[in-house]
Amino acid sequence: MAEPRVFLKENRDRIEENYLEQAKNLPRVFAPVDEKLQKCTEEVALACKYLYAFMPYSDIGNYPFEVFLDYAENGVRLWKENPQVADLPEEIFLNYVLFHRVNEEEIAQCRTYFRAEIGSRIQGMNFREAALEVNYWCAEEATYHCTDDRTLSAISVYRRGNGRCGEESVFTVNALRSVGVPARQVYAPKWSHCDDNHAWVEIWCDGKWYFLGACEPEEILNKGWFTNASSRAMMIHSRVFDTKIPEGEVIGTDGMVTMLNELKRYAVTKEITVTVKDAQGLPSEGAEVSFEVLNYSEYAPIAEKKTDSKGTARLTTGLGSLHISARMCSDGEWFYAETVMNTEKEDNCELCLVSQDKRNDGESEKWTAADIFAPHDAPVNTDMPTLEQKAKGNKRLTAANAHREQKVRNWSNPECERFLEKKVNRIEEAIAASYREDLLRVLTEKDRTDCISDVLEEHLELAIPYHGMMKKDTFVSYVLNPRVDDEVLQKYRREIKKHFSRTEKQELRDDPSRIWNLIEKAIVSRPEKERSSVITTPAGCIRTCTGSFLSKKILFVAIARTLGVAARLNPHDRSMEYMKNGRFVPVLARTEKNCTLILKAGETVQWKYFQNWSIAKLENGRYTSLKLGAENFEDQILNLPLESGNYRILTSNRLPNGNMFANEYHFEIQPGETKEIELVLREADLEDMLENISMPEFMLKTEDGTEVKASDLTADGKHILMFLEEEKEPTEHILNEMMEQEEAFAGYAEQIIFVVRSKEALETPTLSKALAKLKNIQIYYDDFSEIINTLGRRMYVDPDKLPLIIVTNGILNGIYATSGYNVGTGDMLLRLM
């Protein structure tokens, strides 16, 4: 007779050991946790201990035991009731079924609820089948919506019905884990071919990982709109919170989180070697090497490594350009080196460290060109659904969209209504009532979808005594407002107030800077126990006596507001400020900006910060981009007060094929110096802008409904495909440009294909006028439900912006694309033809 399975037999001892270590470090917090664990079954208690052993300190401080109990109980039940789950390797079960955290989202109970909603739909399915079905359920409940940087909990995404890609994937991973399908979020931290990033989901079955688009169901795995885009990535990563790292290439850490390289599943890769040497030419062991891509006009890290005893660091990456920098500290002095490497043509590079203080010694300050190449489009995942699967999927997706749209129609957070409708019984409550709408109004749109009435009630009740002591706008925004940064909105005012005597409160009001002194003494930062982007709430800091630097700054604002002092984090640099004599003053003395940089724009380029230029300062062996606020060029001049030191200006011109023409300008500026620099954007030749992208076959319709293959339409020479949105400004612009150059475009009219939704579109004023002038243009029809998205994604332009314009040269060979309206599109099309 087979022995009964023992829950987490292989990992039991290390879980207990790590849990005891956490409890030893935070005894006050863990005493009540231990009491509650004694009331749990042995398996549930062990599951809870695993969560507590490997969660960030911020989670321990932010959330009550009952939140994690939901994850533990659901995980144990899955292990007991589902043989597929029980058969999983323990490390897979622990990290990708049981664990509560996906990335940096708010944590809330959801697993038991999701399992109840989904369970019956996947009865009898294997993991592969279940993953596909769960993703249809996710599409029924949520879709993409651009929002702010705070990451919603999975249950909040479900309730409001939308989220950005990072939130959709958090939601989908939780849904999958809730029914026992091992799942994780993966990220392209920065694309190389465009200024953006993306997150999606991987599921584990049959001993390997497969991917899917979160809330974007397909009939097969390893298929998503990003399949081609991911083949052009230089890095795709996953993360692990456990200290026992599974097999894979470690590409860096973020506090307690380990980042793993997942690129081989998506792109053609190679291993590169970086050798770092000191000024004497000897290997530099322990140098930090940062691998970076140019994105949003700054070099953004995608992986970090340390050199070995031979001074080398190795990375598996894609075939494109990387900016590689190295730094090392010796006897308190920082040394630095950097280069650009095209990994398609180079296997290794060498960096020689120099003192950062001598970075520009002897160098004439000038612009230096850098050509940045994006990897070529080379998908390694080429599976496609059959026509039958595609038809089935389209039908199901239409039904999912209808279900979701019905669900979210007129939806609002009932907690907001509850807060607004609270009964007013006393005179002092009548005053508070007048501020209820003000409090909701000062919150973000996202806050209003997941805020909790009881939390708002405490903030209102304890802030109201200060309402008459300052201007109303100041009171509402900087005293009443519960939101400081991107922290989880929770109660904290009552807990803060009870920590101080009446005398202490008055002393802190008289000199708010003393609040920071108290925080520095009482709250310890343990970065090795945190995830830098996960904030410990003010109440969590007080409970655990720990918090990151950002968490402590938020705590400062929270304490100040609780005591009736208007306070904030400066919106440009997150520095702490409180109001004194009607203006905000810094808590910590800022480094003096003792010199001035005058930037000249020239007359031909519209400069946009973090779009085509940026400036960074070299400190501690690393360039850090400045966070410019409302500074704008006036009369082609921008005056920037700076701290003295070494700087690097970057300008970048993103080409349609994803490559970039970059320009770098390194300079040193001395105290009291005024320096003038003219920004220079490198121009591109036509041949630099063209691509050769194989587009999928698609069908268009003639006026009588006959289907025509796009391969037939694009067979001979060059053509311009234009998907038009009649009477909308971007489409009107390009039509007007074409009519202004009527004679030139008339010569190519037979090679121009207008695609519209209906015959009625042809009767609108501008479009009918354009067709009258350019008589031989071909007209075809499509409902724009699918082809627009497919072609836009394939050509690496935004499919949500019309008109979509594609120039082809040969059968289904796209050489240029643009979407929306861009000045000069008409001229560009003529150049291409």
Question: In which residue ranges do the predicted regions lie?
Answer:
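A short, amphipathic beta-strand motif
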Residues: 270-281, 595-605
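Hydrophobic/aromatic-rich core segments of domains that either
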Residues: 2-5, 116, 120-136, 145-156, ...
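Thioredoxin-like thiol-disulfide oxidoreductase module
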Residues: 761-801
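Short, acidic Ser/Thr/Gly-rich low-complexity loop/linker segments typical of extracellular
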Residues: 295-317, 620-638
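Short Pro-Gly-centered beta-turn/loop motif in secreted/extracellular proteins
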Residues: 311-325, 329-331, 340-343, 632-657, ...
